[in-house]
Structures are given as C-alpha cells and as structure tokens.
C-alpha cells in the first residue's frame, strides 16, 4: 500500500440493491470488507450511501404510494434508521465505529454550516471513525431529485480533503454510447475534462429506485476534478474494486484531477480580498515563515476589522508588513477575546472552540 490516502466511496441504490427491490446484504458485506481492509492499512474512508428510500420501501412491505416528494420523504424517514443500522452492524464486525452525517445542500451553501460540517467530518476521520453520509431526505424538499447523492459525494470529497472519489454504479464506467442498447459501445478509460460532447453520451438510471444517472455522475466528477480530486466511475460488482482504486489500478473511467486540492485552495486564498487584518508577534512570524506552522491565538497582538469565521484575512508582522493571507477559524470578535492566550484557554474564554489554531497552515499562503 502507498501512504495514507482519503477515499470517498459513493454507493448508489442500484449497487446496494443489485437491481432488485431490496437491499443486497451479501454484496454490502463484501463492500464493507474491502473498506475495512483499507481502513486497517491506515487509509481514511468516507461512505456516501444511497438506499434510504429503498430500505424504507422494503421495511414497509413495498406499499403502493404515489410518486410524490411526500411519499419519498416518508420512505426515507422509515428507511434511514434501517440503513444506518446495517452499516453500523457490518463495520462493527471489524471493530470499526461509524458516524452518521445527514446533510442538505444548504449545509454546503452557508459558510458557517459548511465549516461546521467540514470540522465534524475531519474530526471523525482524525479519530479513525468512518463517516457515513446521506442526504437528509426526510426533511429536504428540492434536494430529492436526480443525482443528489452523486453531487453530494463530490461535496463530501471536498469537505474531507479527499485524494480520490469513487462513484460505484451498476455500469463498468462511462461508455461512448449506452452499452445496454448498443453492443458497439466502448469504455472510456481516461477523461481530462468534462465537455458537452462527453455529456451527450451519458444515459439515465433504469433501476427505478435511485435518484441518479450517469449524467449526474459526470456533474459530480466535474466538480471534484475542478477541486483537485481524482474521480473514478466503476462497477460496484467488480471484485476488489475499492482496493484497486486505492492501488492506482486502472478500473472503470478515471477523471483526472485538474490540480491538487491544496493548490486550488491556496490559489483561492491568494485571490480573495482580505476581510480583515491581524498583527502577530515575532515568534508567530518566525513559526509561520520559517517552519510553516499554523497561527496560534497566543501569537496574535491585535485584530482589525469585522469578519466572519471562514473568511480570508491578512496577517501582518509588528512592522506592518503583509506576511501571509489565511482563512480564519474564528470570527473577529472571538479572535480579539482569545488573542495572546494559550490554545488550552479557548473553551474557557469563549465557551466553545473550533480547534487550537486561529489560522491552519493548510488554509494559509505566505507572501
């Protein structure tokens, strides 16, 4: 195995059911085994799972319901607990804990909620817990639509700072035409950018239980690749597919990342106008510039301006020189209160904390 990597695995309804009307538990057992093997080798695994609606339908005995949002939410409300219970039972066989995260698109669009979701997800990973993520279908409205969990998996990959995103489906990958109706269709092994020509070959879901098709997987791949994350669309029934992806073995269709996640993030930080400014002491200046360290509250001398958590701020030395730009973990009022204090005092001063640093080194670019 190579060095530790973070992998987000999205499992569609067609994979979890095997195209039937019920969850294929034997197949899910095998997928969990593959994930557990990687987890034991030191890799960080995130699961984005579909199947709540299918699980609810199965549990209720396949009721005849109208094809409405309310019916889908009813089934999701019943099925979500059954689904997460299954994941918990199977991972516990390997002594692995899971943590459930139910998200909506609104969690991604609001800065504060985005940062909270990111911090929660990364805290789970840091503690060797496998996050299991799903759309909060029981309360979502417009979110229940084609491809929601495909796109959600791309956003989860960004939140996790993932190296790879694996979209498992009932197809081998992306083909030049629909292989179910065209025997001449060929597998596209490598993609270096999603364009209109590529979108035109994407087909639709045929399982009737899921909410995603190949076109939405292209959308997800496009988003992830632009964020610097390699994305693979592959068959969930291929033996050892998850391990193969982590080993770099060619499977399915690989969408090559356009830049590394860190490069993309630092490019954004460099270009964003600072929302405020902080001045730091000589010790903090040396730590950041010479050792590439994060900025701790202890090193902050003053805070200028009003800004929110998650905004880019300018960091200056005692002579007023602009030495770095970075994303603040705390808003301006909080930074004023904890400036000059040790990180261990943050919770006592604020009544909460978002970690021991004011600006993390991964969220900073020195000038």
UniProtKB/Swiss-Prot annotation:
Subcellular location: Cytoplasm
GO cellular component: cytosol
Binding, ATP: 10, 169-170, 211-217
Binding site for substrate: 50, 137, 149
Pfam families: AA_kinase, PUA
Gene Ontology molecular functions: ATP binding; glutamate 5-kinase activity; RNA binding
Keyword Membrane on entry: no
EC number in record: 2.7.2.11
SMART domains: PUA
Chain's role: Catalyzes the transfer of a phosphate group to glutamate to form L-glutamate 5-phosphate.
NCBIfam families: proB
Homology family: Belongs to the glutamate 5-kinase family.
Annotated protein name in UniProt: Glutamate 5-kinase
Species per Swiss-Prot/TrEMBL record: Salmonella paratyphi A (strain AKU_12601)
């Amino acid at each position: 195995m190579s060095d530790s990597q973070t992998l987000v695995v999205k499992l569609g309804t067609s994979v979890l059911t095997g195209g039937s009307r019920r969850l294929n538990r034997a197949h899910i057992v095998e997928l969990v085994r593959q994930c557990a093997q990687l987890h034991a080798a030191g890799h960080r695994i995130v699961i984005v799972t579909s199947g709540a609606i299918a699980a609810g339908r199965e549990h209720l005995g396949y009721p005849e319901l109208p094809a409405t949002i309310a019916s889908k939410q009813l089934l999701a409300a019943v099925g979500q607990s059954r689904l997460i219970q299954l994941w918990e039972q199977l991972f516990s066989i390997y002594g692995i804990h899971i943590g459930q995260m139910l998200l909506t698109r609104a969690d991604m669009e609001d800065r504060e909620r985005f940062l909270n979701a990111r911090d929660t997800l990364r805290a789970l990973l840091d503690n060797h817990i496998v996050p299991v993520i799903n759309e909060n279908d029981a309360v979502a409205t417009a979110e229940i639509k084609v491809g929601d969990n495909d796109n959600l998996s791309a956003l989860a990959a960004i939140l996790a700072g993932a190296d790879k995103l694996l979209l498992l489906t009932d197809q081998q990958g992306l083909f030049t035409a629909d292989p179910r109706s065209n025997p001449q269709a060929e597998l596209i092994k490598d993609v270096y950018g999603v364009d209109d020509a590529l979108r035109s070959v994407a087909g639709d879901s045929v399982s009737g239980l899921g909410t995603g098709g190949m076109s939405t997987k292209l959308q997800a791949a496009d988003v992830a690749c632009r964020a610097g994350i390699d994305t693979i669309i592959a068959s969930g029934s291929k033996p050892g597919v998850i391990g193969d992806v982590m080993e770099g073995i060619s499977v399915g269709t690989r969408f090559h990342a356009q830049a590394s996640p860190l490069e993309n993030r630092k490019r954004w930080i460099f270009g964003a106008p600072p929302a405020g400014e902080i001045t730091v002491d000589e010790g903090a200046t040396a730590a950041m510039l010479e050792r590439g360290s994060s900025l701790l509250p202890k090193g902050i001398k003053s805070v200028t301006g009003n800004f929110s958590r998650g905004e880019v701020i300018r960091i200056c030395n005692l002579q007023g020189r602009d030495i770095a730009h970075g994303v603040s973990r705390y808003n301006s009022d909080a930074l004023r209160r904890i400036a000059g204090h040790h990180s261990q005092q943050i919770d006592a001063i604020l009544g909460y904390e978002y970690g021991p640093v004011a600006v993390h080194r991964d969220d900073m670019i020195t000038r």
